[in-house]
Amino acid sequence: MEDFVRQCFNPMIVELAEKAMKEYGEDPKIETNKFAAICTHLEVCFMYSDFHFIDERGESTIVESSDPNALLKHRFEIIEGRDRTMAWTVVNSICNTTGVEKPKFLPDLYDYKENRFIEIGVTRREVHTYYLEKANKIKSEKTHIHIFSFTGEEMATKADYTLDEESRARIKTRLYTIRQEMASRGLWDSFRQSERGEETIEERFEITGTMRRLADQSLPPNFSSLENFRAYVDGFEPNGCIEGKLSQMSKEVNARIEPFLKTTPRPLRLPDGPPCFQRSKFLLMDALKLSIEDPSHEGEGIPLYDAIKCMKTFFGWKEPNIVKPHEKGINPNYLLAWKQVLAELQDIENEEKIPKTKNMRKTSQLKWALGEKMAPEKVDFEDCKDVSDLRQYDSDEPQPRSLASWIQSEFNKACELTDSSWIELDEIGEDVAPIEHIASMRRNYFTAEVSHCRATEYIMKGVYINTALLNASCAAMDDFQLIPMISKCRTKEGRRKTNLYGFIIKGRSHLRNDTDVVNFVSMEFSLTDPRLEPHKWEKYCILEIGDMLLRTAIGQVSRPMFLYVRTNGTSKIKMKWGMEMRRCLLQSLQQIESMIEAESSVKEKDMTREFFENKSETWPIGESPKGMEEGSIGKVCRTLLAKSVFNSLYASPQLEGFSAESRKLLLVVQALRDNLEPGTFDLGGLYEAIEECLINDPWVLLNASWFNSFLTHALK
């Protein structure tokens, strides 16, 4: 076929077709039928315009031999065959000079006599099927469509064929000749069958045998065959009479399609109630680290050794007291638990050799905090299916909570830069293939933008805590093991640093199923005074445990140091995902890559370097009540990363539901912005599905409030 194309068509046409295919990443040597189709289409476009001129009186005329004295202007502007950028430039300039409406898709020709764009189609199938597909795709009254087939049939908008008989006959004869030539070489059948529908992604594979019979049996009334039904569906014009068409189809269907206009959508209703509270497994912006630089002590890298070394850097310990009690808990037990940790760490130091792990004594306060013997005994269903009053124990409906400002502050903080680097370059994974040169360049640029980001610190902290907790849960099932919360980073000068955020004590952990829960008590250092936003700390009991000297611009100031204590729980599956939080880096890198790809395809070259190094350019980050927020490419990287990290830290069924359902509304709104005139049915049901996920989760509530900002600005 490739040889045939090169013999049969003018070299200029062949060259243009090759260029067009390369632009879309296709290979003329492999996709030979497509190669032939593009050449045929180009030739028809050129023949359509050949010999047609407009004379000085503005009349259309046909001139076959060139008369050098005639003042003639080409009747048709050829758009097909130019590269995309040039083609759009031509279309724009035509629209500007003639006032014709700009088409959504690139047409093939412009007719200066009739003042309209023309879409030329060449099909190996039925002309009316192809015509319907074209019309359905371009959805424009203004663009004229003219379809030719290889069998000599043609079809045009309003049966207006634009050209005279003879010019059209020339085109039909040429198409017939191409068909004969292909047939004589045994190429026609494959070429005829290879035609895809207009821009429809799914392959039209043939349905045969039983499936075909079933398909024919299950057609709606009034359709004789599957082909007949397909043609009807392809030409389905959403122009207000959908309801009528639906009612023909089935007695069961009674959806009313409502047009979706700028005034249609309302904001999402966020719940009322007390403000939502912090529910992450560890503190985020409020965390405080005790750190050692360039650790070189004995046993460096063993968590317990590192933790003791970090504890020794602080000298301001004092007698702990409760500053914000937990509403429901036995607060003195939390206080006793912290005192026990201090005492047992002291005991370790008095021993000759520090052990690698530390199991806490099973005191009454720890048994209480870790819910020892509290959970109802789990019994195998087989052993109790005969029990008459078997039931699931009651659980309360969750209480609705309102959005609180702290979660937006948490998110803003997560996007900020810290003064340490939390990942090395290879954290995102190595190249697999040599072709990955561009990929590694992108990865390195991206890593440079996010390595100092606070969200990256949260990733490493999350990975560490979940790994340590899962290890201990498997290795010391019955023990109340003390697990230091540690992270490692590098300072600006490249010095290594080990940080201690606090401790976890894990409860009994006989985890048979993925969802079996292990309880733990977390105790985390902080300088945040809980009395500023008490609602955020509903689940915590907070102690004041020391005073810390801080260097500030005005000299040294002493600030109280707090310990945030709470009981919490997690499961094997949650810890497994927590250990894989580095995936967030990959997810946000891929989002950035798709932005670069989009730029590169417009500019027809790889834009990675310009993308990251052009510091003056700003990019859209997201909607806020103030409007569209913009920022540097680094800010975009960090914001995308923070979103991905928060999806992991605040993962919940509410988030799953909200993401899935709100996406549907988002797509409709985007269709409206793109002037695609969307229609909807049961919009109320969609709102209900979205709003039933807005209960009490801070991250979901924040996303819903962002969604409302987006709606406001999108529909202005």
UniProtKB/Swiss-Prot annotation:
Binding site for Mn(2+) 1: 41, 108, 119-120
Cofactor: how and how many bound: Binds 2 manganese ions per subunit.
Subcellular location: Host cytoplasm; Host nucleus
GO process annotations (BP): cap snatching; DNA-templated transcription; symbiont-mediated suppression of host gene expression; symbiont-mediated suppression of host mRNA transcription via inhibition of RNA polymerase II activity; viral RNA genome replication; viral translational frameshifting
Annotated positions binding Mn(2+) 2: 80, 108
Xref: Pfam families: Flu_PA (PF00603)
First-listed, main subcellular location of the protein, grouped into a coarse class: host cell
Motif mapping: Nuclear localization signal 2 (NLS2): 184-247
Motif (Nuclear localization signal 1 (NLS1)): 124-139
Top-level EC class as recorded in UniProt: hydrolase
EC number: 3.1.-.-
Annotated HAMAP family: INFV_PA
Job of this protein: Plays an essential role in viral RNA transcription and replication by forming the heterotrimeric polymerase complex together with PB1 and PB2 subunits. The complex transcribes viral mRNAs by using a unique mechanism called cap-snatching. It consists in the hijacking and cleavage of host capped pre-mRNAs. These short capped RNAs are then used as primers for viral mRNAs. The PB2 subunit is responsible for the binding of the 5' cap of cellular pre-mRNAs which are subsequently cleaved after 10-13 nucleotides by the PA subunit that carries the endonuclease activity.
Family from the record: Belongs to the influenza viruses PA family.
Annotated protein name in UniProt: Polymerase acidic protein
Species this protein is from: Influenza A virus (strain A/Chicken/Hong Kong/715.5/2001 H5N1 genotype E)
